[in-house]
Amino acid sequence: MTSLFAQEIRLSKRHEEIVSQRLMLLQQMENKLGDQHTEKASQLQTVETAFKRNLSLLKDIEAAEKSLQTRIHPLPRPEVVSLETRYWASVEEYIPKWEQFLLGRAPYPFAVENQNEAENTIQNEAQR
């Protein structure tokens, strides 16, 4: 009977050791989980900060680019704008004639007399 009693005491001590070790491991797991949550929150904060910084830098770069573009390519002078407008109006006027010619449905759109007229117009423009 004493041997059973001694074995019972030994098993009870072993049980206490196992329970104690289990509690210690559970505490370590909780601590590690808490550390992981803290680290993850820190990383998330770092990512958000970096994102905001990058967004700010991108806006600054775009503003600088826009500023440089206006300095490099200022708005054209009114004479140039007028010339460009007249050019495109002329192009739009002659598109149907050239289109028919290019499709093979009409003769060359400018006759010799039109060429003389065009030369006179150019000379008149140059004299102004």
From Swiss-Prot:
Q: Which Pfam families match?
A: CEP15-like
Q: Does the keyword ATP-binding apply?
A: no
Q: Which segments cross the bilayer?
A: none
Which key words are in the record?
Cell projection
> What Gene Ontology terms describe where this protein resides (cellular component)?
cilium
Stated role:
May play a role in ciliary assembly.
Official protein name in the record: Centrosomal protein 15
Q: Which organism is it from?
A: Homo sapiens (Human)
* Gene name per UniProt: CEP15
